[in-house]
Every structure is written in C-alpha cells, then in structure tokens.
C-alpha cells in the first residue's frame, strides 16, 4: 500500500500539482492528540469515517487530506490509531467550515466527517500503527522547517522600523540601549538556531533522523519568532493598531491609514501566538526532551 501511495502522490506533490492538509487535532484532542475520537470502521474494502478535525490549515484549498483516525478502542490510546489518506476534499460527507483568526485571516478550518468513505488501500502502514507514522512525520515537521531565513528577514524588518521611529522625541529607537539589547539577544537566538539547523541538515544528508533536536528547534524557533513580533509591534506603537485585513489581500490597491509595515505587524503578532502551540506545544516538546534525551 505504501509503495502504491508513493507512486500515486509523490510526483504530483513535488510538481506542486496537488496540496494535502493535515487532519490531526480535534476539539479536546490537541496536545493530548492520542485521545482523538474520530472513528474509522471497516466496511469491506473501505473505512467509514465519522468525527471532526479542527485547526486544519489550508483545508479550504487542499485537494487531499492525511489524517489520524481511531480504528480500535482497546488497549492504550496510541495503539488504536491508524493513518489514512482522503482522496478528495470533495468526498461525499466531508464538510469544511472556516475559522477566522483574531487577525481576520481564513487559514484554519474545522472539518466534519459524516460517513466519509476512504479505501483501506489508502492506509499508510499497518492498521492501529498510525501513531508511529504520525510521530515520525511530526519529528520532521518540527525539525524540517528552516526557521532562520524567515527570522533573519523579520529581524531586519524590526531594525528598519527602529531606525525610522523616534524614541520619546529624542533620537531613534534603534539607539535606545534597552531596545538595542533586546534586538541583539534576538539575533543571538537566531544565530544559535541556525547552527542547530545546519547540524540537522548535515545529519539528514547522512540518513539520520533529527530526533529530539527537532523539539529544540521548534521551541527556539517559535519563541524567537514571537519575540521579534513583540519587538515589531512595540517599535511601531500606534501604527500597529489599525485593523485592516482587507489591505493584506491580493489585488488590494487602496491607500492605507498607516505605513506598510504597520499593516502586517499586528496580524503577525496575533497569528504567531499559535506558533508555540501547533505541531505539539512547547510544553510537550520540553517533556519529549526530558524523557527521550535526558531520561527524566
């Protein structure tokens, strides 16, 4: 099954012809993902799926979904989960409802399954072994992202704001020792993360998995991102306050009430509050490091 799925999907994914969304989190099953309730019952050559997924990024534009479903209720929670593919987001019984974020964006959704059928052949790995597949995938999701290019770009944005904004009417914000110190701390965090990322890339090129280092990367990357967002909003002050989500839409050409950077600073700040939660909260990542790396 796995090899057929690779042949069917991987070339189209690489070519950018199809997009998958990820069906993991559920209402009440986020950080405690193994408690998920979405059920798949075998019916001949199909699974019949009922339940719901939430915070599903891009479900409204995706072609397919990979998701975790419960196929057994006995034993440990982790032992009754399977990893399946949904061939089409237009499958009968599958409904996508938007969730608009605090920033006014539609990025995430709630997905409902009402007797949705998917072939048993779309299962990845053995039945009831989906937890192992999901953990492997999350290891690369946390450690496979290159945080530093985005963080360096964001750092330069904040520096540019600080060079242009006055501080209490005397000089520029960039010259304020306290603010400059926090910028320097953020840059050190990024440089440290960059070294870790390069080490992980080196390991991957040798066929090694990132292991618990991926949890360290996720913690440092997401917390540094939030630190920069906070500095950006602080530097812009009231310029970051206006709520103009339409100004960030493709094709919008009306004048805005604040400078360009003021349009994105607060939405980034609000959206990235979730960076320390998704893909496994940072508290969970610290638990993983404590158990797997430190043996605590």
Give residue spans per PLM region.
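Glycine-rich beta->alpha junctions and the first turn(s) of the following alpha-helix
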Residues: 94-193, 275, 291
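C-terminal helix-coil-helix/basic helical segment that borders enzyme active sites and/or dimer interfaces
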Residues: 167-170, 191-255
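Glycine-rich phosphate/cofactor-binding loops in nucleotide/flavin-utilizing enzymes
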Residues: 133-140, 144-148, 239-296
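Glycine-rich phosphate/pyrophosphate-binding beta-alpha loops
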Residues: 54-59, 102-103, 274-281
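A short, Trp-centered hydrophobic/proline-enriched beta-strand micro-motif
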Residues: 16-24
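A short core secondary-structure module
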Residues: 46, 50-97
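A structural signal for short hydrophobic beta-strand segments in well-ordered beta-sheet cores
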Residues: 38-40, 155
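Short, small-residue-biased leader/transition segments that mark boundaries at the very start
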Residues: 1-2
